[in-house]
């Protein structure tokens, strides 16, 4: 990534003439990294697709609750499924996601991305099955079990974020030199965004099979159970995923210097955390309560099919923003694509908020404006936050910094969900959109000052810069680059014992470490 605040630090603090541990980045060699065998290319493709696909589970979890909130009220009544219970069940997944993102982000740096992805998959499958099996001697007891199981699903979903996105990005880095951003968006945010409308499609199918409102309990249990299949369908392919050269050479196996990393990347981290908070504060409650919003502008608020159909149209239109962001990210850069998306919140949030009383009388027009707001949200922060956060730091700390950014976003989600109903009840429905516009403005300001402008660059270049920064500040630990050098030296000694000139070979090995292998 191109970032003056980091390269300037590197130029000032790194003096390769005085520190023998300084390594050089060989741009020419790395430019040919995509010229591999068909087998290696296929491995990268499988890793990219398999890593990102199960993120559909996050969209499915949110989208399914949007419709099931209506089902629970109709089946068990507002007394058993009050707004307080609804918020608790919804927030359980959010709290779980926060734990999963943070702790799996740390684990992804210390252990392999592959092992963490497999753990995330298993948690998702088990959690979804237990949601479907929620039971209690009383209805409130059943909802308490559902709350706990939704939290478990949330842990699995949260674990997916750092492990899947980082694995897909690092594999895409080895697959292409010019289109990594667009590829990452299409394999991660597309399934994530499509999960919502896909959940609505599944709901409509199950609703029809279960004879409508006659078997509401069967509907919600079936919808939850089907959530098991999305992560399970790619488990085998995830088992076969490959570990990239970027990860092997850029990782630190023990005693990661987090203080130095924070000192090096604080500005970027502030940018990704702040923008993700603003985005999730708006988009998450809008996703969960979209059926509530839609039902408030149609005549028959208990017509589940009508609500679901409008919800599906809204979701499908919003998904169209994903390829727009994928196209722009590799052309105008991540930063300006992010700002473009936030501007949609300002424009359409103000239009809907200021003209809410008029628009709610014209349901199709209301849905179109609402969809445009969500579409630009997907094109900007929805697409770019995962990309920026997964390439804003070196491999050694990429997991934990991505996790911190995503966790901050989910904290924004929790705050947004908690504030959504009180805002509607006390200020009026229009203010949910006006506040979205305010968040869009704040998002643009944070992006402008704290998010670096970048197009494509090799992730390993950033690893080299970070390595050199660490050693120039007295760090004595080992990165993958250093371990590669030690292995080369061992091979040199073995060659010497067989009668080969050691000094000549040793000089060649040092040159390889400093240039070719970096």
Curated annotation (Swiss-Prot):
Residues passing through the membrane, by range: 45-65, 92-112, 115-136, 139-159, 185-205, 217-237, 269-289, 307-327, 336-356, 361-381, 400-420, 431-451
Cellular component, GO, one term: fungal-type vacuole
Location within or outside the cell: Cell membrane
Keyword match Zinc-finger: no
Cytoplasmic side: 1-44, 113-114, 160-184, 238-268, 328-335, 382-399, 452-518
InterPro entries on file: MFS_dom, MFS_sugar_transport-like, MFS_trans_sf, Sugar_transporter_CS
GO molecular function per UniProt: glycerol-3-phosphate transmembrane transporter activity; glycerophosphodiester transmembrane transporter activity
Assigned keywords, A-Z: Cell membrane, Glycoprotein, Membrane, Repeat, Transmembrane, Transmembrane helix, Transport
Main location: membrane
Annotated signal sequence range: none
Induction (free text): Both inositol and phosphate regulate GIT1 transcription and expression is positively regulated by the transcription factor PHO4.
Disulfide bonds: none
Biological process per Gene Ontology, one example term: glycerol-3-phosphate transmembrane transport
Coiled coil (residue ranges): none
Entry similarity comment: Belongs to the major facilitator superfamily. Sugar transporter (TC 2.A.1.1) family.
Name of this protein: Glycerophosphoinositol transporter 1
Organism whose genome encodes this protein: Saccharomyces cerevisiae (strain ATCC 204508 / S288c)
Recorded name of the encoding gene: GIT1
């Amino acid at each position: 990534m191109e970032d003056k605040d980091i390269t300037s630090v590197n130029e000032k603090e790194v003096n390769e003439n005085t520190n023998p541990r300084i390594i050089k980045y060989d741009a020419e060699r790395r430019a040919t990294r995509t010229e591999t065998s068909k087998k290696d290319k296929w491995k990268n493709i499988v890793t990219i697709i398999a890593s990102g696909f199960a993120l559909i589970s996050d969209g499915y979890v949110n989208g399914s609750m949007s419709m099931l909130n209506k089902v629970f009220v109709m089946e068990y009544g507002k007394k058993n499924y009050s707004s307080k219970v609804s918020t608790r069940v919804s927030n359980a997944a959010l709290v779980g996601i926060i734990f999963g993102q943070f702790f799996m982000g740390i684990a992804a740096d210390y252990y392999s991305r592959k092992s963490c992805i497999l753990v995330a998959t298993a948690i998702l499958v088990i959690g979804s099955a237990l949601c479907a099996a929620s039971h209690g001697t009383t209805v409130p007891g059943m909802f308490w079990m559902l709350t706990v199981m939704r939290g478990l699903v949330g842990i699995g979903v949260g674990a997916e974020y750092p492990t899947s996105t980082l694995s897909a990005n690092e594999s895409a880095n080895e697959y292409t030199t010019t289109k990594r951003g667009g590829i990452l968006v299409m394999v991660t945010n597309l399934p994530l965004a499509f999960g919502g409308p896909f959940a609505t499609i599944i709901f409509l199918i199950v609703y029809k099979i279960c004879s409508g409102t006659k078997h509401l309990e069967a509907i919600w249990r079936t919808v939850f159970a089907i959530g098991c299949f999305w992560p399970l369908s790619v488990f085998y392919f995830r088992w076969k995923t490959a570990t990239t050269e970027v990860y092997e050479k850029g990782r630190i196996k023990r005693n990661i210097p987090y203080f130095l990393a924070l000192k090096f990347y604080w500005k970027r981290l502030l940018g990704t955390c702040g923008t993700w908070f603003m985005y999730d504060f708006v988009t998450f409650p809008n996703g969960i309560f979209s059926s509530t919003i839609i039902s408030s502008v149609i005549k028959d608020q208990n017509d589940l099919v009508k609500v679901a159909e409008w919800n599906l149209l809204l979701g499908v239109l919003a998904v169209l923003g994903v390829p727009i962001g994928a196209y722009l990210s590799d052309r105008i850069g991540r930063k300006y694509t992010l700002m473009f998306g936030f501007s949609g919140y300002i424009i359409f949030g103000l239009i809907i908020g200021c003209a809410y009383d008029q628009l709610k009388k014209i349901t199709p027009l209301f849905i179109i404006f609402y969809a445009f707001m969500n579409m630009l949200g997907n094109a900007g922060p929805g697409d770019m936050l995962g990309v920026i956060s997964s390439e804003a730091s070196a491999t050694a700390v990429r997991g934990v910094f991505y996790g911190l950014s995503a966790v901050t976003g989910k904290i924004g989600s929790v705050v947004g969900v908690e504030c959504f109903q009180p805002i509607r009840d006390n200020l009026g429905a229009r203010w949910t959109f006006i506040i979205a516009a305010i968040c869009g403005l704040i998002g643009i300001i944070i992006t402008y000052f704290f998010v670096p402008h970048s197009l494509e660059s090799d992730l390993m270049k950033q690893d080299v810069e970070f390595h050199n920064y660490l050693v120039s500040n007295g760090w004595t630990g080992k990165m993958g680059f250093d371990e590669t050098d030690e292995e080369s030296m061992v091979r040199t000694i073995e060659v010497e014992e067989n009668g080969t000139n050691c000094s000549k070979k040793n000089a060649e090995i040092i040159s390889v470490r400093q240039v070719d292998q970096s």
